[in-house]
């Protein structure tokens, strides 16, 4: 049973799945685990006949906590200001919109379409005002919950509300000194004293109170979140208590997920600069792959993401799942059909005939689309034009090669002469002798080369190196059968014959 189905097996009634983020910096691949986990639960719920909705909360009332490495020093003046009330780095719109907009474009391209809700709008439109009032009138109980469960040390006359100072604009330097609905009187460290209207975006609740207040106000029933929130005494533990004891609701069904690590660099985090923006991934990877990465891995398992060679291995694995789905291969995963369906933007009638790895090879051989189309057709592609799907794969492969491929995976054809010893000449000569008689297919070529090597005195790796040196000037390269096949019989005969003639 897939992890999403397992989560939903005992739920009843309508479900609202909630996810969210504080848009303090570039929204990256690591952040994608939450929204994709939510989307997968949502789609599985619909498949099971459960009436469900899916929301994504943009926590844009959160303050800017520091000047991050990607910001100019001038942003020091905005530290402590709500993200929705700070100008964008490019001067257009707000800070939060600047980072949210490319993310919205990205998730649309991978078929994730939640209702995106600004937390600022929830405050501004009074959606959270009832919850704020309840919290303010139960502040001692909430203080006791935070102190006893969350190990806080809150003392004195504390209120669960943080006004935005009308003088300096900061939200993290104010303290409420009295409350009389709907106004919270406050003082700020800047010296200003004023009133905040809880029915507007004059302020916000602290996170540990705001989270259960959102569950209450938005009727949230399921929420995936990072394991740090689920630690003992963490925000989910205090949230559960506030939900039941203060708001008189059941907390949402939780699903804790592990982090995504960037291979060789650790946990992805905007504040450290260890990120690959989500918008970047769909430039160097087919859109189904990020969905596949999340769908196939249990949320409790951490993911090591490698945008280099590991990406090709991940795509190979996805394509194997696709072939298994159509009965053409097998995988060691009982949930392979579910994983594949949850990965796809649109279910195909048959598997794609051209692998991404193959396209990575082709785009390094052929520079123009006419030659590419001919090579694709030799590989089983049946259309007389390059359709949008394959064109996207071509563009994606080129981008990946330019930005992320390691040097050993890049190549260009060479016409330089190389010197062969007697054993090497013998292999090349035997290869040419019967090349006109073999079936021109990757498997036939592969087997033909292996037969020749088996009869020679050379080690297989040394023999393969001869072929690669002749073709690309180095000892390793793409899978040889496919590579020779795509270069074409005529090119291979001409190139190998010229080498034999030069070294005769």
From Swiss-Prot:
<keyword id="KW-0648">Protein biosynthesis</keyword>
<keyword id="KW-0963">Cytoplasm</keyword>
<dbReference type="GO" id="GO:0005737">
    <property type="term" value="C:cytoplasm"/>
</dbReference>
<feature type="short sequence motif" description="'HIGH' region">
    <location>
        <begin position="23"/>
        <end position="31"/>
    </location>
</feature>
<dbReference type="InterPro" id="IPR014729">
    <property type="entry name" value="Rossmann-like_a/b/a_fold"/>
</dbReference>
<keyword id="KW-0030">Aminoacyl-tRNA synthetase</keyword>
<keyword id="KW-0547">Nucleotide-binding</keyword>
<dbReference type="InterPro" id="IPR020751">
    <property type="entry name" value="aa-tRNA-synth_I_codon-bd_sub2"/>
</dbReference>
<dbReference type="Pfam" id="PF01921">
    <property type="entry name" value="tRNA-synt_1f"/>
</dbReference>
<dbReference type="GO" id="GO:0005524">
    <property type="term" value="F:ATP binding"/>
</dbReference>
<protein>
    <recommendedName>
        <fullName>Lysine--tRNA ligase</fullName>
        <ecNumber>6.1.1.6</ecNumber>
    </recommendedName>
</protein>
<dbReference type="GO" id="GO:0000049">
    <property type="term" value="F:tRNA binding"/>
</dbReference>
<dbReference type="InterPro" id="IPR002904">
    <property type="entry name" value="Lys-tRNA-ligase"/>
</dbReference>
<comment type="similarity">
    <text>Belongs to the class-I aminoacyl-tRNA synthetase family.</text>
</comment>
<keyword id="KW-0067">ATP-binding</keyword>
<dbReference type="GO" id="GO:0006430">
    <property type="term" value="P:lysyl-tRNA aminoacylation"/>
</dbReference>
<keyword id="KW-0436">Ligase</keyword>
<dbReference type="GO" id="GO:0004824">
    <property type="term" value="F:lysine-tRNA ligase activity"/>
</dbReference>
<dbReference type="InterPro" id="IPR001412">
    <property type="entry name" value="aa-tRNA-synth_I_CS"/>
</dbReference>
<dbReference type="InterPro" id="IPR008925">
    <property type="entry name" value="aa_tRNA-synth_I_cd-bd_sf"/>
</dbReference>
């Amino acid at each position: 049973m897939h992890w999403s189905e397992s989560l939903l097996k005992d739920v009843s009634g309508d479900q609202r799945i909630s996810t969210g983020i504080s848009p303090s910096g570039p929204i990256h691949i690591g952040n994608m685990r939450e929204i994709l986990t939510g989307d997968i639960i949502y789609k599985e719920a619909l498949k099971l006949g459960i009436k469900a909705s899916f929301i994504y909360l943009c926590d844009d009332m959160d303050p800017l906590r520091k000047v991050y490495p990607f910001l100019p020093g001038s942003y020091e003046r905005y530290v402590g200001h709500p993200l929705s009330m700070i100008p964008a780095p490019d001067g257009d719109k707000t800070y939060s919109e600047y980072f949210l907009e490319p993310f919205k474009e990205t998730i649309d391209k991978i078929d994730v379409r939640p209702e995106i809700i600004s937390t600022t709008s929830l405050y501004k439109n009074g959606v959270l005002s009832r919850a704020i009032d309840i919290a303010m009138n139960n502040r001692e109980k909430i203080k006791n919950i935070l102190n006893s469960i969350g190990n806080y040390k809150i003392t004195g006359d504390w209120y669960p509300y943080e006004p935005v100072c009308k003088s300096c604009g900061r939200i993290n330097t104010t303290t409420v000194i009295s409350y009389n609905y709907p106004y919270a009187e406050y003082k700020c460290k800047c010296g200003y004293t004023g009133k905040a209207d809880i029915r507007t975006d004059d302020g916000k609740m602290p996170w540990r109170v705001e989270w259960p207040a959102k569950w209450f106000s938005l009727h949230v029933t399921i929420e995936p979140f990072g394991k740090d929130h689920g630690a003992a005494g963490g925000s989910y533990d205090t949230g559960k208590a506030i939900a039941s004891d203060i708001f008189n609701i059941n907390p949402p069904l939780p699903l804790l997920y592990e982090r995504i690590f960037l291979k060789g660099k650790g946990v992805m985090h905007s504040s450290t600069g260890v990120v690959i923006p989500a918008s970047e991934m769909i430039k160097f990877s087919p859109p189904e792959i990020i969905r596949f990465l999340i769908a196939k891995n249990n949320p409790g398992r951490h993911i090591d993401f490698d945008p280099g060679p590991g990406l090709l291995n991940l795509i190979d694995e996805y394509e194997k799942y696709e072939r298994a789905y159509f009965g053409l291969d097998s995988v060691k995963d009982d949930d392979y059909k579910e994983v594949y369906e949850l990965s796809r933007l649109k279910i195909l009638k048959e598997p794609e005939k051209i692998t991404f790895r193959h396209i990575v090879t082709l785009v390094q051989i052929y520079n123009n689309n006419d030659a590419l189309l001919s090579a694709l057709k030799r590989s089983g592609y049946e259309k007389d034009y390059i359709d949008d799907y394959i064109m996207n794969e071509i563009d994606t492969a080129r981008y990946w090669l330019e930005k992320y491929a390691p040097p050993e995976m890049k190549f260009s054809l060479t016409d330089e002469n190389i010197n062969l010893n007697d054993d090497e000449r013998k292999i090349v000569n035997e290869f040419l002798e019967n090349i006109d008689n073999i079936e021109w297919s990757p498997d036939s070529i592969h087997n033909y080369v292996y037969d020749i090597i088996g009869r020679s005195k050379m080690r297989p790796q040394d023999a393969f190196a001869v072929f690669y040196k002749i073709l690309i000037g180095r000892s390793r390269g793409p899978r040889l059968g496919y590579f020779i096949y795509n270069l074409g019989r005529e090119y291979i005969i001409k190139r190998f014959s010229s080498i034999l003639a030069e070294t005769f």
